[in-house]
From Swiss-Prot:
Gene that encodes it: mtfA
NCBIfam families assigned to the protein according to its UniProt record, in alphabetical order: PRK15410.1
Keyword Iron (UniProt): no
GO cellular component: cytosol
UniProt binding sites for Zn(2+): H111, H148, H152, E211
Name this polypeptide is given: Mlc titration factor A
One term of GO molecular function: metallopeptidase activity
Binding note for cofactor: Binds 1 zinc ion per subunit.
Function: Involved in the modulation of the activity of the glucose-phosphotransferase system (glucose-PTS). Interacts with the transcriptional repressor Mlc, preventing its interaction with DNA and leading to the modulation of expression of genes regulated by Mlc, including ptsG, which encodes the PTS system glucose-specific EIICB component.
Organism: Shigella sonnei (strain Ss046)
Family stated for the protein in its record: Belongs to the MtfA family.
Length: 265
């Protein structure tokens, strides 16, 4: 019998968090009971260690907090919560937000412009998100803002800047870079053929290696059926790094649904 961590007797001053309800989103339906229990344990620790900061009047209740924590912890389910030690705060806007962006062009001129962002992440500093896109991260569509920003944090553990290569053994770096760049080229070829809007993988993945790793991490967890057959070698590298196989998880969930359907009387 699985001993659910949120069903343990709590002290009188502590309010039980709605973990069971928080788990009931499409992205997490394929998890086994053991995985759910482990994920909740990590998410509880996440909420103890990190500060969720609502901005611009956004209201953060216990269910929203739990679901945010679960999504943060899904990528590190097997890696461990220490992989998320590069930040202490999560800032949450109600909707995409405007920031001042500074960039340098090819001839060295510095430009400033205001742009709309869904999320932001720095090597040392808070993660910035918005609730509208967090809500869109609950399904299995290939889009997941939280996993995208977590991937950037995991990426920067390997050095001063995001490179698209997370902290893996040195002997595996060349193979990882080869497969990642091959995926970027393949995605770019599709974009040139059908256009960004019709591409089957988010075109942002072709912009640079760091974004490719972050975008494909979204697909790894929320649309493995699109990632695995298209980039099988890179898929295996992601499975080895994250120590998870979401495609196998998806097949198990589908088999369970089929079995249940055939046994309805």
């Amino acid at each position: 019998m699985i001993k659910w961590p949120w069903k343990v007797q709590e002290s009188a001053h502590q309010t039980a968090l709605p973990w069971q309800e928080a788990l009931s989103i499409p992205l997490l339906t394929g998890l086994t009971e053991q995985e759910q229990s482990k994920l909740v344990t990590l998410a509880e620790r996440f909420l103890q260690q990190k500060r969720l900061v609502p901005l611009q009047g956004f209201e953060l209740d216990s269910l929203r907090s739990c679901r945010i924590a679960l999504l943060f912890c899904l990528p590190v389910l097997e890696l461990g919560l220490e992989w998320l030690d590069g930040f202490h705060e999560v800032l949450i806007y109600p909707a995409p937000f405007v920031v001042d962006d500074e960039w340098e062009d090819d001839i060295g001129l510095v430009h400033n412009q205001r742009i709309v962002q869904s999320g932001q992440s720095w090597q040392q500093g808070p993660i910035v998100l918005n609730w509208l896109d967090i809500q869109d991260s609950f399904d299995a569509s290939g889009f997941n803002l939280i996993i995208h920003e977590v991937a950037h944090k995991l990426d920067t553990r390997n050095g001063d800047r995001a490179s698209g290569v997370p902290f893996i053994p040195l002997r595996e770096v060349a193979g990882w870079e080869h497969d990642l760049h091959a995926a970027m080229n393949n995605i770019q070829e599709e974009i040139e053929l059908v256009g960004e809007n019709a591409a089957s993988i988010d075109a942002y993945a072709a912009s640079d290696p760091a974004e490719c790793f972050a975008v494909l991490s979204e697909y790894f967890f929320s649309a493995p059926e699109l990632f695995a057959p298209r980039f099988p070698s890179l898929w295996q590298r992601f499975c080895q790094f994250y120590q998870q196989d979401p495609l196998q998880r998806l097949h198990h969930a589908n088999d369970t649904d089929s079995f249940s359907a055939t046994n309805v009387h």
